Amino acid sequence: MSNVLELTIPASTANLGVGFDSIGMALDKFLHLSVKETSGTKWEYIFHDDASKQLPTDETNFIYHVAQQVAAKYSVDLPNLCIEMRSDIPLARGLGSSASALVGAIYIANYFGDIQLSKHEVLQLATEIEGHPDNVAPTIYGGLIAGYYNDVTKETSVAHIDIPDVDVIVTIPTYELKTEASRRALPQKLTHSEAVKSSAISNTMICALAQHNYELAGKLMQQDGFHEPYRQHLIAEFDEVKTIASQHNAYATVISGAGPTILIFSRKENSGELVRALNRNVVTCHSELVDINVSGVKERIVYQ
């Protein structure tokens, strides 16, 4: 097979404050993969951006590992492949870079192993590997999605929510924050009353989004009790960013995924001034407007 598989895979932001490990939204930052068979004796990698060049090129490469895991599950063998990679999704910043790579790996195994997975099956596989659907679901489908993974039945259920009519700003620090380190900051248990309170806030926030009530949704996004109180100290710029966003009447300022990126839901009439104010004042980060991605992963076959 000499055909080239081209994948364009969006970034994602998870949690939206109170939707811990459940809610996620796709963003217009992308991992681009171009994959074809090689006559070499092992998988080959060509990186076109500086961040990707730090990734391993042996069997510890994440895309290789996941693709082989999927192939083994369906009892198929994959040929040796050459993967060209270009990404504008920063690594370990809370923008779903690992979820994008995971989805890409499943698509690679599916095509070159001729597995014939449906998109629903891709979601089930990705969530089983990742452990929760908050990043992988919007990466696959696009848009804003709430989901639940039942780790007993291994089933994932998702519900699509209307795309918010807001401008999205991401404030990206220069430093990494590994998900594992961010998760270590979380408590092992919550009291029943704490869980009930956070669940009620999350439920109401989703309803507010569904009703396009961004004032209420934003207010509730900032009342999380599941993870943000335990992670904010890991992000030195969080309080300053939130203060500046509030001064510009933003709907909400929350941690994107495990951090350190900070996500802002901004009023459209204020977003330009806000992002410029952030770049003037928070010099250890880069702030930018980013569109919500509505299409999810895109696959194209180039026949040769």
Swiss-Prot record:
Enzyme class: transferase
The protein's name in its UniProt record: Homoserine kinase
Superkingdom: Bacteria
EC number: 2.7.1.39
Organism (species): Staphylococcus aureus (strain MRSA252)
Entry keywords, A to Z: Amino-acid biosynthesis, ATP-binding, Cytoplasm, Kinase, Nucleotide-binding, Threonine biosynthesis, Transferase
Record gene name: thrB
UniProt GO MF annotations: ATP binding; homoserine kinase activity
GO cellular component: cytoplasm
Nucleotide-binding is among the record's keywords: yes
Upper classification of the organism: Bacteria, Bacillati, Bacillota, Bacilli, Bacillales
Residues reported to bind ATP: P90, L91, A92, R93, G94, L95, G96, S97, S98, A99, S100
Chain's role: Catalyzes the ATP-dependent phosphorylation of L-homoserine to L-homoserine phosphate.
